[in-house]
Amino acid sequence: MNESQLILTMVAAVGLGTPLIFATVGEIITERAGILNLGVQGMMLIGAVTGFWATFQTGNLEFGVVIAMVCASALSAVHAFTSITLRVNQIVSGLALALFGSGLASFLGRAGSEPLVGHPSRAQFEPILTGGIADIPIVGPLLFGHDPLVYLSWLVAGAASYYLFRTKMGLSLRAVGEDPASAEAAGVHVSKVRYVHVLIGGALAGLGGAYFSLALTPTWQDDPIGAAGWIAIALVILASWRPWRAVFAAYLFGAAERIQFTLQTLGEPWSDIPSTLLAMLPFILAIVAMIVLTSGKRARFLGAPAALGIPYFREQR
Amino acid sequence: MTRRLIVEPRGLASARLRILVPVLSVLAALVVGGLFLAITGENPLDVYGKMLDAAFGSANGVSNTLISATPLILTGVAAALAFKMLVWNIGGEGQFIMGAVFASGIAIWLGPGAPSWVAIPAVIVAGGVGGAVWASVAAVPRVYLGTNEIITTLMLNFIALSFMNFLIFGSSSPWRDPAVSTFPSGRPIPDTAKLPEFFKRLDIGIFIAIALAVAAWWLIGKTRWGFAVRVVGDSAATARYAGIRVSKKILVVFLLSGAAAGFAGALYVAGPVGALDPRSLDLGLGFTGIIVAALAGLHLLAVIPIAILMGALNNAGPALQSIGVPAATVTMLQGAILIFAVAGEFFIRHRIRLPRREPVSVEMPDGVEPA
């Protein structure tokens, strides 16, 4: 592989990794509150379809992004209600959300007299910071000339990191995820904190979904995001619940997804490797990393919120 | 002071409630689905009428509904078995595919020379083995290293799907039909390995699926071994005190769960599909099994009627497309049914009542509520 192809792969990995950053940081925030939401795939798809629809109606990209975040957040509210208020099984509830969201997104894309499916977006995010600085060798194409949402994703990861580890509210949030009874004794409103952060997680998943339909592949198709929502759930563990690590984990997975196209350009013998096998790579990477990271004593240092997935019964303290 | 609803855990829910919750879940999902249908300009009643007609309105419809239900009975058993043990096997999809790969592989390897009484049992057993092998990739790390099985089983679904695509689209494997060169497809399995049909296109796979579900119910509900398994599912700590080897029980149930999904893959290949055909096997039947199990309250016999209901829904998808309504209506409805079924768990687990009399009012400082 020569240098320029390496750079091209890395630049493509940034594009493919960006929606994963949004969704993963969102899920980190949700899980830090002690709520496991496996419905990321559904929330991302709802974000993708509603964001596309809103931009299709108005031609306004920012409006599309806002609608995507609001709608995905509304979907996550369903999970918040079942897992926080009704305190039912979070795993099954999250899966239900994923199924419902996928079905509804596909339905909305095909329903009505003039369905969205097959239409290109009326607007799409364009690269910024192009020109001179983007021509600096190696650093230029990696740091500059991306669309604005790439920079927003760095901002979101940085802000989430600051919020979690440097603010009082972040401390309360982590307390709720670790030991809700003690947090409540210290005056934190556990249910409220959990609701708020499930909704934030939903909004960020919606933003990640909208990145697919408004920036990465700005045409509406039935299955626009692949398995991104499921991968994001694995990335949370690989990032050990830390937003900054999610950025690097997401780019690593972006690169793993991109590698099949890179190998095509390298000629034999690389191009002979079937793309159907290379498509497995991100998932194999996730499993191996999971087994290595979470087995035995290492698991304790990973930083999983202690109360993750456990319903909180105020009455049974 | 207003009268507050009292929510308290209840012991065993009545049989009436256990039936009422799934029925209301389906009705509530139909209302939600109806709203979305109405927003997009469809008449929900017309759409539902069409679905009912497609599923049960004709002999062909009933036959197709039961064909769709056959794999769902077993993927439902797969999810119910695992979930009972708090083993979160979300990998029914991948285990179903690997069951199909193993089953079609053995059928092609045996060839048309093997008599049906050899080929059919071999295909079904191979399917179970394929599903169990695929489950073991997640089960062994879970049991011996404590690796979270939710993520591993999920990822294994996508790997299995890519592997099936590789066998058909990415290589000239024995699974691929050499006769069709323009568009790759699966090699048809020999007729001797196919399940006999008896009612329209419905084959005996439905009886095999029901028999396996009953066997699973008997194994868990009626045997000594099953009793030990249920103790582990209720409380691993209790089981350990009682001298039950917990990790071995979890491993075996995980593998049985995988085998059940694998059997489903085998019956689908030896039944309606007749080849390892990615287009007919990538339908989310493993995921639908989770809905079946949840709606059945993880009861291994209740899985059977619920699977028929879900099969009816699946079967209605193509009929909707023919009248210009998206087939995804079905997925949307199934997702909504699962959401309401999960929410309904609350009412099975808790009792809500109004206090009979005004409770003795106690003066509390601001912001503090009486416990």
Region roles according to the model:
Chain B
Residues L255, A261, G265-G335:
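Transmembrane alpha-helical segments in multi-pass inner-membrane proteins
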Residues P9-L20, F83-G92, G113-P184, L219-R224, ...:
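Short loop segments and helix-boundary regions at transmembrane helix junctions
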Residues P22-L37, T75-A80, A100-I106, G127-G131, ...:
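Hydrophobic core segments of alpha-helical transmembrane domains in multi-pass membrane transport
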Residues M1-A28, G34-A38, D234, Y241-K248, ...:
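Cytosolic-side transmembrane-helix boundaries in multi-pass membrane proteins
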